[in-house]
Amino acid sequence: MTHQTHAYHMVDPSPWPLTGALSALLMTSGLTMWFHYHSVVLLFLGLMTNTLTMFQWWRDVVREGTFQGHHTPVVQEGLRYGMILFITSEVLFFTGFFWAFYHSSLAPTPELGSYWPPVGVYPLNPLEVPLLNTSVLLASGVTITWAHHSLMEGNRKNMLQALLITILLGVYFTLLQMFEYYEASFTISDGIYGSTFFVTTGFHGLHVIIGSTFLLTCFIRQLKFHFTSNHHFGFEAAAWYWHFVDVVWLFLYLSIYWWGS
């Protein structure tokens, strides 16, 4: 048995970064094949590889943080910094999309009829499904905070209830977004408006799905008594991510749905 005289976690060799990179290659190649040749085989393989990688990598990290006790206060501090940097990178990621939208909408080119929205594009009514989506995400922000406070107070039942409501609201948001896409009178091919609308809202929708998966993992972990009132960074990181998704949607709603229409 080996001993260490420091509080840091020396991570064991892992195959998951390699399989994660492979899944990213398969998914991007699969999307290209799907768009141009209507073949979903590569995309399906990529999604399957990504799901398996995600499940097994999460399993290893959970095992290290619970049963093996590797997540000391020093390690948790490092994880916090890592999550903050990750969310910062996501902020910059969405900044690029908002930049593209405002660049195109504040000074529309003659090709667009010098008009925004472009001639022939009929934007969605911001007071219908988009407003409902906004209320759903704001409600989920309240319930995730309720879950966090319940966890810190040691109230397991309320924490599970609030977390389950948050997950259901996330799923409901995704279904509403799918319905909205189906009903839209324009597509991603309809010029700069369609491109910026679907890419920005689509990536946000992807982040909602990722966040819902993150919260579902936390829900299962809480069922197995993995979290305590003072040792629950996995849940805290998921809550930070969810609040980030909320804030991005508010900017997205005000910019693209309300002002942009």
Swiss-Prot record:
GO cellular component terms given for this protein: mitochondrial inner membrane; respiratory chain complex IV
EC number in record: 7.1.1.9
GO function terms (MF aspect): cytochrome-c oxidase activity
Bilayer topology: Multi-pass membrane protein
GO biological process, one term: mitochondrial electron transport, cytochrome c to oxygen
UniProt-annotated location(s): Mitochondrion inner membrane
Similarity comment text for this entry: Belongs to the cytochrome c oxidase subunit 3 family.
Identification of the protein by name: Cytochrome c oxidase subunit 3
